[in-house]
């Protein structure tokens, strides 16, 4: 008799004389593992716990406390929600897709005669609880493609039919729980009773298959956790995130707006927001000049032929906007790199000229689908702090280290911790093995030399080169992709960039794309939520407000305001005939760092009484001393 040999992650081997399942193997190892098991990976393929194992291979039990396990748990919760919605709304609703996503899951529904709202959530959650209590077995079924089409057509699930018709496979997998059936690859939990804690959180619109040409669906977002304590912790964090929502704070502080008249995803900056953005951009310019970058500028539109040369036309044109000028096609730039290539090519370069570091705060436009637009965090028009570093191969290691040090210093200024990932060569790529080895080695060496911890994403680099991604962590422990360092073998080749080496021969330079903050709009959105609108003094659009106690001090308050403004302080003067407490509270709501109260005593002494927005009072001081105080506080960022 041939034994089935199963190799476990620790290298141990278990033998079985007959067919077994991952669930049985987990139970044989220990009851604790069996309770935590949600799925398995057998020979690098994700499977259910009840999947029969009939051959030898490698097995890993996937538990609930792993990212993959939580994804399986939430994917099953998505099916549970769809089941509940179908039970409650019947044939009025068609189900479409429902994946697990970061921090939860969603399911998209088509329903002509009912608009889902938070008012429906309690009813849906109640039905979900009933299905959990019923502990329905969740069973996988392999059927022919034609049988699946016939089944879902009979059920009136036309979106499922469309999905299956687009598949080439002769068979598809279905998952059943009670009278609910869904098209799915799996894996899933063994039964509905394994789901312990969930909450529906919001509803939004989403186009079928992400195309505005298709029907508008209703997307219900939700989350699920292994226990109620974890769920409560997450919901508390979610509530705090709502309070910090940059769209709400941006409106309350009069920073920016969006208008359907202008177009979706296009930011309109109000005076305070434009000033905040200007302060941030000025900071970037100073830092780049200090670190040896040259500031450059490129046009907003470039000829279509140039986008064909770069490869963007073939690979990115669906995300671009095009126009015609005097019969000549032009593309509105979605990226800043092409003008930088032309600047380099404007004259012959020598090895003595390198490295060249071109920096541009360049505004770009990308045709993002309307369903993914989200305040400042996802827009169609935005400005990137793009730089392209063109250097010799021998200079690559040092240039990468310089960029990483730049990122480290900037993140410290804003108070962000961050995580680093390096992505290596994918299966489909361009460039020689030597190019990839040199570039990947340079990225790795820089991280090692600077003692920066990092994760490696094998095979996740771009086709044109390896990269480092830096994700900052905000006050709510959320991750945001901002800085990127990307090696590029494509553009130097496509634009025939060369330099004359010490040997008098022409050589191909190495190029790095890099951003530090990324999109300025997105970074400001992250800053607003990180600080909850309480910007540090150097970034605050209004640094202080002068508040008079009575009309007697109005002239003095105005003179103080004028003097501070002349000294470079961004100041307002509140002379309204309102009570002092009211004006102080309003300044706190506006998140102005300092309130300078002036009454008869201050007027007589020629001073102001500073009060921080937290309520802490400073000793009275002269307007000149306060201006110096602000100057010293902000000098480190100038």
Swiss-Prot record:
It comes from the Bacteria. Binds 1 zinc ion per subunit. Its cofactor is Zn(2+). It is found in: Cytoplasm. Residues 1-63 form the TGS domain. GO terms for molecular function: ATP binding; metal ion binding; threonine-tRNA ligase activity; tRNA binding. Keywords: Aminoacyl-tRNA synthetase, ATP-binding, Cytoplasm, Ligase, Metal-binding, Nucleotide-binding, Protein biosynthesis, RNA-binding, tRNA-binding, Zinc. One of its GO terms (biological process) is threonyl-tRNA aminoacylation. GO terms for cellular component: cytosol. Catalyzes the attachment of threonine to tRNA(Thr) in a two-step reaction: L-threonine is first activated by ATP to form Thr-AMP and then transferred to the acceptor end of tRNA(Thr). Also edits incorrectly charged L-seryl-tRNA(Thr). Homodimer. This is Threonine--tRNA ligase. It comes from Syntrophotalea carbinolica (strain DSM 2380 / NBRC 103641 / GraBd1) (Pelobacter carbinolicus).
